[in-house]
């Protein structure tokens, strides 16, 4: 992966985390440590249904394969 690919993926994840944090701030604890994101204390089961199904590259985000 080159730098551009990492930036695109990073921005995508950041937007998703911020968006989700605004929806579930009272329900979830989101801790970011280095490259790993840990979401805990969620009362909303939809979170665990959505996360495994997320495919960043299916939403019009095209990253050339290296």
UniProtKB/Swiss-Prot annotation:
Topological domains (Cytoplasmic): residue ranges? Answer: 24-66
List, alphabetically, the Pfam families matched. TGBp3
Chief localisation class: host cell
For this record, an example GO cellular component is:
host cell endoplasmic reticulum membrane
- Matching InterPro entries, A to Z? TGBp3
Q: Keywords assigned by UniProt?
A: Host endoplasmic reticulum, Host membrane, Membrane, Transmembrane, Transmembrane helix, Transport, Viral movement protein
Per the entry, what this protein does is: Plays a role in viral cell-to-cell propagation, by facilitating genome transport to neighboring plant cells through plasmosdesmata. May induce the formation of granular vesicles derived from the Endoplasmic reticulum, which align on actin filaments.
Q: Which organism is it from?
A: White clover mosaic virus (strain O) (WCMV)
Q: Which GO terms describe its biological process?
A: transport of virus in host, cell to cell
Something else known: TGBp1, TGBp2 and TGBp3 seem to act together for cell-to-cell propagation. TGBp1 is the main movement protein that physically cross the plasmodesma with the viral genome. TGBp2 and TGBp3 would facilitate TGBp1 function.
Q: Which domain of life is it from?
A: Viruses
Q: Which residues cross the membrane?
A: 3-23
Q: Which family does it belong to?
A: Belongs to the Tymovirales TGBp3 protein family.
Q: Which residues lie on this side of the membrane: Lumenal?
A: 1-2
Instruction: Specify the protein name.
Output: Movement protein TGBp3
Localisation: Host endoplasmic reticulum membrane
């Amino acid at each position: 992966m080159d730098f551009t690919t990492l930036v695109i993926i990073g921005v995508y994840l950041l937007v998703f985390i911020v968006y989700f944090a605004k929806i579930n701030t009272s329900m979830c604890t989101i801790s970011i440590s280095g490259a790993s994101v840990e979401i805990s204390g969620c009362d909303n089961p939809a979170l665990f249904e959505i996360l495994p199904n997320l495919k960043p590259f299916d939403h019009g985000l095209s990253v050339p394969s290296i």
